[in-house]
Amino acid sequence: MKVLALWQGMGGVEYHRLYTPLKRLQIDHAEEIEVNVSQDFQKAGLPELKQYDLVLFNRDLGENHYEILHYLAKHEIPYIVDIDDYWVLPKFHPVYKYYREHKLKQRIIDAIRYADGVTTTTDFLANEIRQYNQNVQVLPNALDLTDEQWLLEPQQRDVITFGWVGGITHSNDIMLISDAIAQMCDYYGDKVRFVLCGYQPGSMWESILYKFNGCAEKLRSQVVVAPSQNVNEYGNFYRLFDVALAPLENTKWNNCKSELKIIEAAAYGLPVIASEVAPYLSINPGVKFTVNTPEAWFAAMRQMYEQADLKIVGENNQKHTNKIHDLTTINQKRLAFFKQLCK
């Protein structure tokens, strides 16, 4: 089976939903699948698509979106679109205006509607997709734990450290824990630390840092900023702390996301404090769930701080997550789905 994956650039989506699983498929099932990649596909290359049994992409194909879809349909070349996010963006999203101007919502819906199959991350998002296409395969996110970024030694620390890893789309989520961080810093003084991971210069990140800093103008001594890293290196962040924070507003946009932060924390055997909202609702003995109030977040952080067996809680997350998000097992389902569409 000869497969072509199309993507533009290498962001987190491409890395987790296409590059990582397809790399392992090629390594583990070389006798059954040949994976080719194009990161800058042009319409001049349309005739070359005939040599492939299956074409894969995530969400959208760029400026040649409809021409490529039309060519695939005309020549009966099956394709799978992978959907990892809800296609209706909240108005505060940084690319909301761009989505509207370029009609990306409709382009994504059409990609789903005409696809031979759709892959996605969760049952919640799969139910949204089924409005347009019934042939949906849930393939949860999973890490390739043989990658170096998930195998590094933890940083030596002398105080309990909480950390958050994320991007500029999570500004509202960070606000949920702002007061709790301020209370923790006041309560424990220099015996606690918070690490903000992924920082880049710019007004949106400055807003996130302000909130993460407990809305204090001067950077607190307990708050550390770790600059952005590449997608094949950012796993290093999880070496820097003892407890991962996963605050999330209860919105449909967020409900359609995956539990990737819990999966990443599990790679380093870390416990997690997460908002009690989808997609974080699955029972996990290594995750402390909390409602989204400052008092509840402060209480959850204090409870985790005082936890005598913190390492055991983290190991529970690791064991639980490794069973559900095992890349080898998920890739067997992925390969079977590919074969089904190539008959």
What are these regions (language model features)?
Residues 143-159, 343:
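Acidic anion/phosphate-binding donor-loop and adjacent secondary structure
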